[in-house]
Amino acid sequence: MELENKLKKVTLGHEEGFGAPCLKCKEKCEGFELHFWRKVCRNCKCGQEEHSILSNNEDDRKVGKLFEDTKYTALIAKLKTDGIPTYKRNVMILTSPVAAKKDVSINTVTYEWAPPVQNQALARRYMELIPKDKQPVAGSEGAQYRKKQLAKQLPAHDQDPSKCHELSPNEVKQMEQFVKKYKNEVLGVGDVKLPKEVEAQACGAGRSTNGSLSTLTTVKGTEDKVAAQKESTYYCFRCKENMREGDPAVYAERAGYDKLWHPSCFVCFTCNELLVDMIYFWKNGKLYCGRHYCDSEKPRCAGCDELIFSNEYTQAEGLNWHLKHFCCFDCDCVLAGEIYVMVNDKPVCKLCYVKNHAVSCQGCHNAIDPEVQRVSYNGFHWHAAPECFICSCCSKCLIGQKFMPIQGMVFCSVDCKKKMSS
């Protein structure tokens, strides 16, 4: 009964972000409208993350659900109204005086997310060490980047069966087991600390850093200088460069005390993007974002973007597809056993290809069927037929012959070219 109730709650959140403008297509898109089962806009075919959707509440609920039943419950709160776990995102507001002609004004900068550390100076320095265009200052390019990465790296349909399209009871059960396993074994949240604090924490826990976290070097100077000086150096696990004295580092508990990262180096092994809000998945000595960890464990449907838990699925063009989702990207007709053409890595049926994507023949001005041979040169196309690929002057068939192309026209000889230009 409980499983049936979960299936009844299935929703793709079609109301969320409805009408939001597309940041990529601009005025060409009429506004966001979620496709029935694809995770794209029905109007422009761009993803939800490409639209200007104000979704802080929904994002916080998504991350809150991710942290539910994990060791990171301190980062969530449950609303009394519905009991849904919500991410207690750390927002940092910095104020600084700005000199004015008559008075001193206060400049306020709000970060939509910041490392949850007590030392604000450490959090501020962390922000300075990541690229400026990725700093999540409210209303900035960096804030938009964070929203986009939340959607990309932590898709709701990778953790919540109710966000998926028509899963069977068995698929729901498999997905729940999969999510429970990664929450227990690989999910983690980075911690921002000074390297010496991590070393002290390791010593307090009675664990060895194997010498890779820090090395102590004694330098002997002359009598008029300091007799002995101790210098502690720490290096980044990713780039192998030293940490600067006093700069914060990112520590990942699942990776162990002997590994630290520069803030800008705490990235996914696959996509190389900053791990959003320092949420990571640790596997085989590598950091992954949620999406790419799941991709390393399960096939993902190229149609609906969901993980595949069914034993039966199809493969085409090097991609995986649910059997019911191997469909035309334009009209959604099922393509099993049908002729299709790949357009921008998306399968399109023959009818839609001819209607929406086919190039026109310079000879007859009709669309060129995908199965018909063609001649292409410098962006111009012709049917490879004696009635189409002909001299623009004398109509001689040019198939298999030398020709002279001039602005979409072709000529069999210099004489014909001169006749047309005179």
From Swiss-Prot:
Disulfide pattern: none
Protein name, per record: Testin
Function according to Swiss-Prot or TrEMBL: Scaffold protein that may play a role in cell adhesion, cell spreading and in the reorganization of the actin cytoskeleton. May inhibit cell growth. Regulates cranial neural crest migration. Acts together with prickle1 to control axial elongation.
MF GO annotations: zinc ion binding
Domain free text: The N-terminal and the C-terminal halves of the protein can associate with each other, thereby hindering interactions with other proteins.
Biological source species: Xenopus tropicalis
Domain LIM zinc-binding: 234-299, 300-359, 360-422
Composition bias type Basic and acidic residues, residue spans: 155-165
A cellular-component GO term for this protein: cytoplasm
InterPro entries (UniProt xref): LIM1_Testin, LIM2_Testin, LIM3_Testin, PET_domain, PET_testin, Pk/Esn/Tes, Znf_LIM
PROSITE patterns: LIM_DOMAIN_1, LIM_DOMAIN_2, PET
Claim: Zinc is one of the keywords in the record: yes
An annotated GO BP: neural crest cell migration
Domain named PET: residues: 92-199
Organism superkingdom: Eukaryota
Keyword terms, alphabetized: Cell junction, Cytoplasm, Developmental protein, LIM domain, Metal-binding, Repeat, Zinc
Transmembrane segments: none
Location within or outside the cell: Cytoplasm, Cell cortex; Cell junction, Focal adhesion
Main location: cytoplasm
Protein family: Belongs to the prickle / espinas / testin family.
Keyword Lipid biosynthesis: no
Region (Disordered): 135-165
PANTHER family: LIM DOMAIN-CONTAINING PROTEIN (PTHR24211), TESTIN (PTHR24211:SF1)
